[in-house]
Amino acid sequence: MFYSLMTGQRFSSIPAKTRWVVLFLATALTARFTLAHLRFGQTNILVLALVVLALTWFSQRKALQTGIAAGFSMSIKLTALPFVIWFLARRSNKVLLGICLAGLIAILLPASIVGLRRNLDYHREWFERVVMSDPQGSGSWSGTGNLSLRAQADRFFSTAGAFDYKGKLYRVTIIELPKKIVRVLVILSMLAIATAIIVYARRFRDAPELISLWGGIAFVFSLMPLFSTVTEIPHLVVLLPPYIYVVHVWYCQITADRTFRALVTLSFVLSSLTTKVFFGVFLSRLLTAWGCFSIGLLMLAAAIFRAAICIDTAERRRLSAQREGPLT
């Protein structure tokens, strides 16, 4: 469905070779994450499906329904929270209203079963025992099972263990910093991601829809795992849309920019370095602890941004040539 929305065509009307090559490669690139998701039986595909439903309605100019679907996805898991930043940057007020409405429903719905007071107690307990008891810099989620920037900061700037191999705990500490400074670094990284989303939305707001809308959506999806404070392999099914996007741009030769292609290739290579099938358990864990996977995700986001610059520049030149043509 996402590919059909992105191209503005029915799936059956897309040339057979194109649709199968794009979807096969994108699915192959994310197969590791999908299999892990199915193995652990998590809700990440449901979250992804709700976001895609929201995007379907958004493409149909149904703003309120878009917000409600997106809001319910965030109510299940906060993974999709960066889309709030995206819609804020696009000034989609009705969508934001729908998100708030869905969030309110999700918070109050359990009250119809357990009562309002107990419902509030549950939410307070969750906030105190889960959110406040595990702050950035605590090192409690520093293992390589957590691929977020928050965990990377803990691994590099605290003495927390990075991974265990044959009963021995390994660390990759660069320098030990006070917990408060580590927390500041994590917050700054999240602000940097939010800023990047805003910059993309504002810079390319007048670009062709493939760039302004679908490129932006792919950009947000690619940064979602890094924005979250806890990101595990099953959560990475959300990378399917950005991989569909970059494979489509590459295969259909929408841009032949070498930098874009190098970034996509590096993204795949760095994420593959963390696979124990190729490098064994120890090396895969060590490379993950060093941040290879996080760098790979940043490369993917950079590739999408680079493609937007190249395609938008080419489109502006084409339009400029058309305007100047009749006068010469």
Question: Positions of the model-derived regions?
Answer:
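Central hydrophobic cores of alpha-helical transmembrane segments
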Residues: 71, 99-104, 216-221, 240, ...
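Membrane-interface alpha helices of multi-pass inner-membrane proteins
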Residues: 64-77, 82-88, 220-227
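Aromatic-enriched
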Residues: 245-328
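Juxtamembrane membrane-interface segments at transmembrane alpha-helix termini
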Residues: 3, 57-62, 82-83, 108-117, ...
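Hydrophobic/aromatic-rich transmembrane helices and adjacent perimembrane loops
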Residues: 232-248
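Primarily membrane-embedded glycan-assembly and transfer machineries that use lipid-linked glycans
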Residues: 1-66, 92-215, 220-228, 233, ...
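Membrane-embedded alpha-helical segments of multi-pass membrane proteins
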Residues: 45-50, 73-79, 100, 188, ...
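A cytosolic-side transmembrane-helix exit/cap motif
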Residues: 66-71, 117-125, 255-264, 283-285
